[in-house]
Amino acid sequence: MHLSAVLNALLVSVLAAVLWKHVRLREHAAALEEEVAAGRQAPAPGPAPRADYARALQLLSEGGTHMVCTGRTHTDRVCRFKWLCYSNEAEEFIFFHGNASVMLPNLGSRRFQPALLDLSTVEDHNTQYFNFVELPAAALRFLPKPVFVPDVALVANRFNPDNLMHVFHDDLLPLFYTLRQFPGLAHEARLFFMEGWSEGAHFDLYKLLSPKQPLLRAQLKTLGRLLCFSHAFVGLSKVTTWYQYGFVQPQGPKANILVSGNEIRQFARFMMEKLNVSQAGAPLGEEYILVFSRTQNRLILNEAELLLALAQEFQMKTVTVSLEDQAFADVVRLVSNASMLVSVHGAQLVTALFLPRGATVVELFPYAVNPDHYTPYKTLATLPGMDLQYVAWRNMMPENTVTHPERPWDQGGIAHLDRAEQARILQSREVPRHLCCRNPEWLFRIYQDTKVDIPSLIQTVRRVVKGRPGPRKQKWTVGLYPGKVREARCQASVQGASEARLTVSWQIPWNLKYLKVREVKYEVWLQEQGENTYVPYILALQNHTFTENIKPFTTYLVWVRCIFNKTLLGPFADVLVCNT
């Protein structure tokens, strides 16, 4: 075949691919335009009767924008708007002041210190702030004709849609529970992502959260110059997040984690249903250990040897899985039935949230990377109610690592640094604590390839996993707390001028008779009125007579509460005032 013929054939195929992509993009844009075309006639969402365009414009022009928010500060605020608008030309939201406008909280200039709210769940990040420009409603006469979006909108930012850990932790989980925070929102809302990213590698996962196609900021320009939302919710609940990435202080678990494994597992169940993944029985017909395999970086250099050793030690099949080569639904199917998940530290480990109860997570750390400094997956695995076992293994042998100093800086290369800094990094035995996100020593070490020392890994795993690893049925493990003790009362008796007795009694919390509890104890605090200190007692019975240091003709304050299984502390009953 002549070279010219080959080139012509190649050119035709490339041109056909380009034209096909162009046609698909045009079809997608046309579909979006058709969806909002009705917005020029009928802005009201949901089952309510649809007002005509003139009525919608009148409501906006006369009444203006309406805003009511929950949360006290910009880091925990979610706001509900009526008639919030967005200018595609200015790329800003607009609050129109009319005769029915409400703005709660009405912060004045404090709205800019630093913002009304965070659009993403990464707290107080200066690229994630939301605010709006204020205009009188009369200014609508001089602006482009508004297009009314017919959907209830949930407006937010994705933080890093190309990283699976960020996708789940920062976006999907918070979106899932924010949609359920307000009645009907999960079934009505369309997601509007305003951060400016393209769809990214995991956009199909976002589509699972709502029956309506999510829209990106770039797509809004095809819909009109001025968009107005009859109903919009702005911001995300952060209550499901468990980790901070080190923008202000070195990364680590959040100081006040408010989510448990119960909420994580309910979200995982929803995602599995949407992905059409069944957890009924192992897909391979038997129990197995699953090892994440990577092909570009952070390689396990002796992967085959590792698979064989794990199979021999635990007497079960070992299987590899790869996000690079397999569909995400297939990955979830394998993870959700695995007895053990083994992986080098990386975003793929967030899939541990799909593991069955009783499974084990084994996280491998390259040379010079301290497992105690990087714990997003340990924190996830050890949340109350996740019921997972967690093992961290660290390569302590420099001869078992392969580094890549020649790579680009964002893949761990250090050739761009001066020679002294390169030498320091090469000689370092541990990456010091650091802030996010471009620390060259951290990147150099985390992108190493590792030959796993099999005996030390097996020994490390066996410290945690004593028997055969594997899923197991477990009873409800998230603790149920006692209520208040009931009918607390006290009775005193005086014996002479210097001795007295104080008897305190109470009834069990009313919810105790409906619960199976291994151990019930009671905590009593005894304080002489006017003193700053109290004496605590742990008691097994529902009454007790106190004699030590009880004075006659003295007032005592007494608090009583119930404790289940040593750790589940109930509320104190109302204070008893006891006179001897």
Swiss-Prot record:
The chain crosses the membrane at residues 5-25. Pathway: Protein modification; protein glycosylation. The keyword Flavoprotein does not apply. Residues 26-580 are lumenal. It catalyses: 3-O-(alpha-D-mannosyl)-L-threonyl-[protein] + UDP-N-acetyl-alpha-D-glucosamine = 3-O-(N-acetyl-beta-D-glucosaminyl-(1->4)-alpha-D-mannosyl)-L-threonyl-[protein] + UDP + H(+). GO terms for cellular component: endoplasmic reticulum; endoplasmic reticulum membrane. Residues 488-580 form the Fibronectin type-III domain. GO terms for molecular function: acetylglucosaminyltransferase activity. It is a single-pass type II membrane protein. Its main location: endoplasmic reticulum. Glycans are attached at residues 99, 276. Gene3D superfamilies: Immunoglobulins (2.60.40.10). The keyword Glycosyltransferase applies. It is found in: Endoplasmic reticulum membrane. Keywords: Endoplasmic reticulum, Glycoprotein, Glycosyltransferase, Membrane, Signal-anchor, Transferase, Transmembrane, Transmembrane helix. It comes from the Eukaryota. Residues 1-4 are cytoplasmic. Its EC number is 2.4.1.312. Pfam families: Glyco_transf_61 (PF04577). InterPro entries: FN3_dom, FN3_sf, Glyco_transf_61_cat, Glycosyltransferase_61, Ig-like_fold. This is Protein O-linked-mannose beta-1,4-N-acetylglucosaminyltransferase 2. It comes from Canis lupus familiaris (Dog).
